[in-house]
Amino acid sequence: MSKVQEVLSKLAGKAKAARAALKGDAGVLATLEGEHAEVAMLMKAVLDEGHDDHDPEALECRRELFHKIRIALLAHAKSEEQEFYGVLELRPATRDRATHSEIEHREIEHLIRRLDHMAESDLGWMPTFASLQMKVEAHVRDEETLLFDEAKLVLDKHELREIDERYKAARRRYQELLEGDSHTTHDSGHASV
């Protein structure tokens, strides 16, 4: 079993436990919280496993985990903007918060693009990745506390379930598109945004 497979196997169990621990939120909110938890675990694994800039196995682990994180974050952001923020921007009570969240997505995408253009062995790669992790954590914290609370005030459970169905379909499409684009790469080996 490769180092990456070993890490992913451990994370699969933790992700399942995290999803089971989520209680109370309906529809798209629960889905988004579950995805946030999974990406957080993958990001932690990069920081835990990928520190040696000269070890080929550590670099391969870093490369594969980042590829998964990259696809997860980009598919999540595009789908969330399209299906969740799009609805919230139509409501005066949630418009500003949803717009702010989209701005944070652009900042996250910028950091992903910076990492795309760096070799995983570059000394600046891990500090840039750590910046990405901090930006994602801050975004998730704001979203799950502030935006989700506001969304619960303007959307009923039926609407949250409908948005969830559309979100999941959009995410599958974006994920397939991003995975297909992996064959069209930059010098670093990552797909373009």
Regions found by a protein language model. Name each.
Residues 1-193:
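Small-residue-biased structural context
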